[in-house]
Amino acid sequence: MRSPCPCNSGKLYADCCAPFISKDALPATPEQLMRSRYSAFVIQDGDYLIATWHPQAVAEAWRDEITAGFRTTRWRDLAVQECAAGQDSDSGYVTFLALFYDERQRRNGFIHERSRFVRLNERWYYVDGRHIVPGRNAPCPCGSGLKYKKCCEQ
């Protein structure tokens, strides 16, 4: 795939997330893992998503839900807003805004999250995330041009 990487890094997919998703390399940072997970959502690679969730999450149980989401969700954009170290070298956080179109509801949506990552045995895993909710009168992050209270909050 000689196209731009879906993660919006500015690199080609082959030089960015592809080596991680194809298991030819391991992400060296939480940001690389987060970007590659976003790309996996875009290209609908459930195996990679499940493999990069923290083992205690038992993500395999969500396979059907993940696959169903692939059928109805079209990912539109990713903006990494902040990368922060955790309390030690084996933890970190990435704050991002991901935009998507939900074909079931026929509307735009977003995920604004501060994701938590940990490194176990030299490998980074996604643990969980804290959703960031905009103020009611703030512009809706989905890109509609409406206030949040008149758009995605409903």
Swiss-Prot record:
SUPFAM superfamilies: NTF2-like (SSF54427), Sec-C motif (SSF103642)
Matches recorded under Pfam families: SEC-C, YchJ_M-like
Highest taxon of the lineage: Bacteria
InterPro entries, A to Z: NTF2-like_dom_sf, SEC_C_motif, UPF0225, YchJ-like_M
Gene3D superfamilies linked: 3.10.450.50
Family per similarity comment: Belongs to the UPF0225 family.
Name the UniProt record assigns to this protein: UPF0225 protein SG1365
Organism of provenance: Sodalis glossinidius (strain morsitans)
Source species taxonomy: Bacteria, Pseudomonadati, Pseudomonadota, Gammaproteobacteria, Enterobacterales
